[in-house]
Each structure stands twice: as structure tokens, then as C-alpha cells.
């Protein structure tokens, strides 16, 4: 019975990696952050969080891709907790969390870029490290944004 449970437990976790608050190299947005990434054989799931002023709106566009270091683009398949291509108004808390499902990222990719589009206001997060323990660990940087000190786990950002 123990052997069966052990076999079942290991097979359920096979091919799946979870990265809590992944490190990244650059970003052009202070209101959207990736708080978790799950890499499975079926999909790459980003748990994103938007923090801004209550009742302000934002939009996640359906053309968003993850672009690997190889140049390959992984398409956005669906979203949960948010409607794509529509204005979404933040609740009174000023915070909203949702999941974005992308095509599965190839095993060989070490970093990806989150690319919403080519316009300068489109969200971009570059060099997202797909490793639970990145080799080059920089200390967290304190960033002064809109008179608030925020903590970012960015490599060389701020």
C-alpha cells in the first residue's frame, strides 16, 4: 500500500514545476506582477495580480504571448478570474488576482518574456527566470514608486 501511494504521489508531480514570485530582469509596469507560475505538460499558468487605485480599469489582451529565449512564442489560451480584451474595473481593495493559461513552455527554455503587444503602454516583463532557485540571486530592491516603497524581485531593475 505504501509503494502504491508513493508511486501515485510521484506521478502526480511529474512534469510540473511551480515558481512562487519568479525573478525577472525588466518590467515596464508597476501595477501588474506575476505572483506564481506553474509549468506543466498541458499549460503554463501565470497567476497575475494587479494592484492600483480602486475603480480604475485595466485590460489583458488576448494577443499576449510568452516569448522564450529561443524566439518561440507561446500563445495565451484562456483566462480565469478575468475577461480578456475587456475593461476590468478594480474593486474597492484596489487588487485583483487571476490566472492566464498559455501553451506549455518547452523544457529547454530558461527564461521567457511576458509580451502583451508592441505598443509602448503594453505590459512587458522581460527575462522571467523559469527556475525555482535562480543561480544569480540579487537582493530584493527597494523601489520608490508613487511615494510608496514597494519590494520587487527584479534582477537589475530600479
List each model region and its residues.
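Short, solvent-exposed, Trp/other aromatic-anchored flexible loops in extracytoplasmic proteins
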Residues: 77-111, 119
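Pro/Ala/Gly-rich low-complexity, hydrophilic intrinsically disordered segments
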Residues: 122-158
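Short, well-ordered beta-strand segments enriched in hydrophobic/aromatic residues
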Residues: 42-52, 158
Amino acid at each position: 500500500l505504501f509503494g502504491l501511494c508513493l508511486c501515485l504521489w510521484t506521478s502526480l508531480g511529474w512534469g510540473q514545476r511551480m515558481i512562487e514570485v519568479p525573478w525577472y530582469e525588466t518590467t515596464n509596469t508597476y501595477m501588474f506582477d506575476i505572483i506564481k507560475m506553474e509549468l506543466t505538460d498541458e499549460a503554463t499558468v501565470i497567476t497575475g495580480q494587479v494592484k492600483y487605485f480602486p475603480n480604475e480599469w485595466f485590460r489583458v489582451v488576448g494577443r499576449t504571448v510568452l516569448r522564450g529565449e529561443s524566439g518561440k512564442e507561446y500563445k495565451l489560451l484562456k483566462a480565469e478570474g478575468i475577461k480578456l480584451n475587456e475593461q476590468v474595473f478594480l474593486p474597492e481593495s484596489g487588487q485583483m488576482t487571476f490566472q492566464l493559461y498559455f501553451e506549455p513552455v518547452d523544457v529547454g527554455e530558461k527564461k521567457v518574456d511576458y509580451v502583451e503587444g508592441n505598443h509602448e503602454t503594453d505590459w512587458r516583463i522581460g527575462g522571467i527566470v523559469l527556475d525555482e532557485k535562480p543561480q544569480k540571486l540579487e537582493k530584493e530592491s527597494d523601489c520608490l514608486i508613487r511615494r510608496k516603497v514597494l519590494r520587487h524581485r527584479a534582477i537589475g531593475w530600479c
